[in-house]
Amino acid sequence: MKVYFFDEVENTQELAISKFSSEPILIIARKQLKGRGRKGNDWENADQALACSFAFSLEKDHQNTSLLPLIAGYEFSSLYEEREVFLKWPNDLIVDEKKIGG
């Protein structure tokens, strides 16, 4: 897997798509200027937050991707052991009724 780190990018998702070939790719940025959320909504990076996008291809037999956002949210929540983390569809991480990631 190729991993790229940037101090600042326009959009991690667009960059991941443009750099993706056949090998999985992870784009991580300290600051994202023009992030997009679900349904094209603007996504703003909080200070001291990371923005990341992961791109990979699926085999034809495994193209049902409906659970992937929830699986990703679960995996990230399992890394956060200090507090109880709740998941909200599709991949939001909620602590003390506040979104901490997604």
Predicted features along the sequence, with ranges:
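N-terminal lobe of the biotin/lipoate ligase/transferase fold
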Residues: 1-79, 83, 100-101
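Catalytic palm active-site di-aspartate
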Residues: 83-97
